[in-house]
């Protein structure tokens, strides 16, 4: 098989678009990997700080920032991401998902340049804010794009590529940062931060060669392009394929339903009909932060300092959890579509609070005060004595096990889930608000955690353990199952108001809708529906084809 055939490369001219001169790739896995490079950038950001905060060259060059200042530098990226997430839907809904991904790449590159060239704390913060805005665009647009373009049976796998890219980005840049520790002077962090531009450049180029979201095109009455894209992804270009026609009919009927509520705004997310989805989406992203994982990522060097590890030993030990994060995410890409979202999230929550309480218990029992801090850092106020290796190893093992259960559950599951629960009309703004919530709590934790480590030390883990208990309970009672359902069926499941714990085997019966002439189009999700629409001479698909031909 040639590379062109494997990529499903098609030289299709799309009228009236900036991207019409470029051939497009229709291999859904390649599409997903390109769109989710924004996740790689997110991971690069996390590791770019965690690999540098313990180095003397970083501390000396940036005037030995205290815990509050360091929290501000770290949080500046999340602050920019929060802003970018809220702005993103205005571009994504008006100009397309691809435009948002291009803005993501452009802002990220600009921010990386400023960070690489930073002369002081202020310039570093400005660069991180701009890069953060890019990540805000990407974290809102990429999961939405992947959920809208993927066939239902593999939607979890494709959408999960975003989180997989995050884990790869963390691991890759951490090891780059570790290698740069052996370089003298400011070049150590400048090379590390400068290399952040690479995924931005790849995304900038790659977006030209992926198709637009068919659901976005349908919402903008561009049916010919919608048909071509769905056909090329699902059936190698066969527009008459039964599965292709069925997906197009689902999209068309959802567009009819959505057309009754144009100009959907953020305030509409809090109306009675939409509020349950909004609560679930916002709380899911909130819990992903409050479970403590990003604390493990941003501040892993501090954690291992508490366990008695210093210098290169600390960095090497810290890097293992980044490898585990990648390795444990890979099987989840395929298993989440087999076992479902709810079981994965609930089991993950149970094990996460187990290991958080384990870390807290070991540190509370075996650590001793460390006046003046550890290794010159007053943020770390306790340490396990060097002779107590069993306790130190217990902290390390619990940290690793936490990562092993977070990665395949709340790591990958939430970005998939929040891109599925909203309908076409709500999806851009609903996903953006959910992502903005993630970034808001990311910002708050980046500011809070250094001070928490300094003032309450091991009790910090008790707080995150309690949060993990709470998220497990809410997941059981409020998070419906979305596995194997079309996006349109998921929307109807909310309308039917089925208890979350009964949704795994529930098959929604979508309401009868009519075309503009009053003809019934049948029940969406009902096997008879396909025959109803095919036999209806005035169905929307035939009328849209006629309209295209007349034009």
Curated annotation (Swiss-Prot):
Question: What is this protein's function?
Answer: High-affinity glucose transporter.
Looking at the keywords, is Glycoprotein present?
yes
Topologically, how does it sit relative to the membrane? Answer: Multi-pass membrane protein
Q: Which domain of life is it from?
A: Eukaryota
Q: Which GO terms describe its cellular component?
A: membrane
| Gene this protein is translated from | HGT1
SUPFAM superfamilies reported for this sequence: MFS general substrate transporter (SSF103473)
Q: Where in the cell is it found?
A: Membrane
UniProt protein name: High-affinity glucose transporter
Ranges that cross the membrane: 28-48, 71-91, 99-119, 124-144, 156-176, 191-211, 290-310, 316-336, 344-364, 396-416, 433-453, 460-480
